[in-house]
Every structure is written in structure tokens, then in C-alpha cells.
Amino acid sequence: MEYYEQEEYATVTSAPPKRPAGRTKFRETRHPVYRGVRRRGPAGRWVCEVREPNKKSRIWLGTFATAEAAARAHDVAALALRGRGACLNFADSARLLRVDPATLATPDDIRRAAIELAESCPHDAAAAAASSSAAAVEASAAAAPAMMMQYQDDMAATPSSYDYAYYGNMDFDQPSYYYDGMGGGGEYQSWQMDGDDDGGAGGYGGGDVTLWSY
């Protein structure tokens, strides 16, 4: 029995859940796509709880084997608590629900109907794959800044390969032709100032030529 038209509801596609701003030091367990769903323990099980409108209390709906089952349970509670103002994880949850959400008056009634829908609804393998892919993308995005910082630290601690290639083969204990020439003797000065090398034409040799001659 259809109590509401499924297209009248907002979904996580049209109104995605808000993510907390800034960096957090705790491990994120909430599902990146589905509302009211979070991971519990290393076994990979999923739990669902919803906050009652205008209250601080929450309604515990249970632990489920898949994130999709927990997301279905959330939809039942959202329909019961918020009516047409509910934001659903799946657009067809209202159509698949076998009871009128308005009749779910107590937390026990909501929990019972939520578990029934979660267990009876066929879980789409494509939806499960998309959920896993979204979680992997989020984990990769969170790890990227740490990887970049590690890369920068490694680059700062490693000497430049160019500097090593240029200076690594120089023997600083050997005489330097450059500094020998600057000292006023040696091969460098003889080669630079000897005019006989170019026949005395066009060079600095070929006679007594001084700087002030120009």
C-alpha cells in the first residue's frame, strides 16, 4: 500500500548530509552518504539511530549487516517522526513500507517497523558497491594531505641530486686553475694574457696594451 508519493520526499541525493568543518582528531564512523548510519567496530557492521524532533533523546533502531539495511531502517523512523518533511536515504522507502508511518506512535513501534523493512527489502548490489566506493574516496581524500606533508619532508631531508652531481666529483684538495690565475701566475694567466697565441691581432697581446689605451 502506498501512503505517500515517493517523489514528494527529499533524499540524500537532493539534500546530502552536511560534513563537519575543520580537521578532527577522532576517527570518522558516519557513513559518507546515508543519513543516520555509522560503522560499529572492526567487523564492519552498521548501526542506526535517529534523534527525536525537538528533543535530545535518540531512538536506537539496531545493528545491521549492511549500510543499506541500516539506511532503510533510518527511513522508517524519519517517516514516522517527520512525515512529509523527512529526508530519505532511498526514494522508494515510503512505497515499500507496509504500514502507515502515522500509526508508529512509540519507539518500539518505530524500531519494529524499521527492522522489518530492513530485513525484507532486497538490497541492490549496485547501491552497496556505490556506498563502498564513496567510503574509499573519502578515506583517500583524508589521507592525501598527510601523504603530501610526508613527501615534502622527504624532499627537504634529501640533498639535491643536481648539487651532488655537480659538486660530488670535484676534488677540493687539487690546485684550482681559476684561483691560481687570480694569484698572478700559473697556466691560467699565461694562457689568458699571452698575445703570441693569436698572432698579436685581435687579442690582448701584440704589444704593450694597457687598459687606459681605450
From Swiss-Prot:
GO terms for molecular function: DNA binding; DNA-binding transcription factor activity. SUPFAM superfamilies: DNA-binding domain. Residues 33-91 bind DNA. InterPro entries: AP2/ERF_dom (IPR001471), AP2/ERF_dom_sf (IPR036955), DNA-bd_dom_sf (IPR016177), DRE1A-I (IPR045277). It comes from the Eukaryota. It is found in: Nucleus. Residues 1-24 are annotated as: Disordered. One of its GO terms (cellular component) is nucleus. Pfam families: AP2. Its main location: nucleus. The keyword Lyase does not apply. Keywords: Activator, DNA-binding, Nucleus, Stress response, Transcription, Transcription regulation. Belongs to the AP2/ERF transcription factor family. ERF subfamily. Transcriptional activator that binds specifically to the DNA sequence 5'-[AG]CCGAC-3'. Binding to the C-repeat/DRE element mediates high salinity- and dehydration-inducible transcription. This is Dehydration-responsive element-binding protein 1C. The gene is DREB1C.
